[in-house]
Amino acid sequence: MATIACASIIEQQRLRSSNFVIAQYIDLLCIVITFVTTYPAIQLVLNKSLFQWSTKMLILESLFFANLYQIFYGIEAITILYKHHFMTSDFCNIMQTESNCAPYLKVILGTTGGMIFAQTGLMIERTCATFLASYRKRKSEIIGFSITIIVFFCSSITGKLFIWDDPLDGMVLGCFILPKNSYKRYNTYFTVCTVLPLFNLGISILLKIYNTKLEYSSRFEVSARFQKREVIDSTGTVCFLAFSLFILLFIYSVGVGALRHLLHENIISQEDFNLCVVWLYTIPFIAMLLPLLLIYRIRRTRSNRIEMLIEFTKQKQSQENHISQMKNMWS
């Protein structure tokens, strides 16, 4: 167990840094946006989308992880700002023990992993929807529920695995800061944060290409075409999410991982590390983008289809033009 100690000069400078404080305010703004946009995102997913229930369950789970992450990270950001504004002259009380921070850190790591695992779960679910001969309501619900449980389990053990044998005898400025004795696991953690989103992105693109080709093979079968349209729209949204989240996760995992390596090799100073790392920590932005991107994608899809139908009903067409218009509407 760590004993209470005064903050080092470096930690004092970090707490006083306007760079560090501005980053916390921006993160809090992301948190507020997440909370405000989650409810309309849920309403759209449940009532206005073409998603099957298996897809809806995993999307709702992603939103749950995003909001839970923002709650716990927001508590730490507010604590940091309180220390900055009211405790700058009391540097023997601003540090926290790693052992006391462990419960918060487990949730932060677990929910971060949960957002990533849920995307992988969506890829598996979309693969099932694409290749299973019959993917009706009952089967899709069983598959979706099973994947949701597995994702939740993986998320719940992520934080525990990260610090399971760490003595947690150090001091940190905030509970979102990783323990110093778990350095060896950083590389594994950041590798997972890069490889899984890249895998998700690759699979989603392949599925989208496959579904588009399959749609045209059944273009004169209205029922089959409509069912495939549902799959394509759902997969397109998942692909859109995967690409957006991959970019931010890549910045986070590669950027922070590289900074930690440079710091460990004494190539950069702790001050330089502290200056840069706050702008590479993109997880609050990822959590914020989940509901925003869902709202954008679902509304855009509905708007495009409505405009196409309105245009279709206003035009008098020949049989050839009618077939061409039908092809465009379903593409």
Curated annotation (Swiss-Prot):
Location of this chain's protein in the cell: Membrane
GO cellular component: membrane
One GO biological process term: detection of chemical stimulus involved in sensory perception
Topology within the bilayer: Multi-pass membrane protein
Main location: membrane
Gene Ontology molecular function terms on file: G protein-coupled receptor activity; olfactory receptor activity
Membrane spanning stretches: 26-46, 58-78, 104-124, 142-162, 189-209, 238-258, 275-295
Family: Belongs to the nematode receptor-like protein sra family.
The protein's name in its UniProt record: Serpentine receptor class alpha-9
Organism: Caenorhabditis elegans
